[in-house]
């Protein structure tokens, strides 16, 4: 049997509400500079976060150990999925980026570029795609190009036009 009273539960509920609504994973867009049209074809992308690279174990006398943080992590990677069009929008993007040195800049929006709470700047991005699978028996799925997006993130935050 629970030991919580309704007053305790209401206190936790009210405290959680004061923190604000939870972010909805789908309420975000990735805008690639020079290829803004791909924002409507971007199904999945990594959301940047600031944190340390890991831990440093610090040994001490008599087997004592402690931890301290490594440097901040600025080189990130994560999954990127782009939905291809019959006109080859993703293939054109990949060819354009490859011809221009393979790197691009991007912005990740909490919202859309027109209406957002805030946005993060992603620097010197490059995409390592996997070859998409095409299957004659699969008439129920769009063609997706998946792979890994590598990028640098320094915590550059852009103020949005939606007041929280």
Describe each model-derived feature in a short phrase.
Residues 1, 9, 144-164:
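Protruding loop/beta-arch "assembly-hinge" segments enriched in small, turn-prone residues
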Residues 1-85, 124-144:
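Solvent-exposed edge beta-strands and adjacent loop segments
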Residues 30, 80, 106-108, 149:
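Hydrophobic beta-strand residues in large extracellular and virion-surface proteins
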Residues 82-86, 110-112, 151-155:
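Beta-strand elements of well-folded, non-transmembrane domains
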Residues 88-93:
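Short, conserved charged micro-motifs
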Residues 94-119:
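Short, acidic/charged, Gly/Pro-enriched secondary-structure junctions
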Residues 115-120, 157-161:
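Short conserved catalytic/interaction loops centered on acidic-Pro-aromatic/His motifs
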């Amino acid at each position: 049997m629970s030991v919580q009273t309704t007053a305790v539960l209401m206190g936790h509920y009210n405290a959680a509400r004061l923190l604000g609504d939870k972010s909805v994973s789908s309420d975000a867009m990735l805008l690639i500079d020079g290829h803004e049209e791909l924002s409507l074809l971007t199904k999945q992308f990594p959301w940047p976060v600031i944190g340390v690279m890991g831990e440093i174990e610090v040994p001490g006398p008599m087997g004592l150990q402690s931890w301290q943080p490594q440097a901040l992590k600025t080189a990130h990677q994560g999954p990127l999925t782009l939905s291809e069009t019959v006109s080859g929008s993703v293939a054109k993007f990949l060819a354009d980026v490859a011809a221009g040195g393979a790197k691009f800049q991007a912005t990740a929006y909490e919202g859309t570029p027109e209406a957002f709470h805030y946005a993060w700047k992603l620097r010197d991005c490059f995409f390592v795609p996997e070859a998409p699978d095409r299957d004659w028996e699969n008439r129920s799925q769009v063609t997706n190009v998946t792979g890994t997006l590598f990028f640098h993130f320094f915590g550059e935050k852009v103020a949005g036009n939606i007041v929280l």
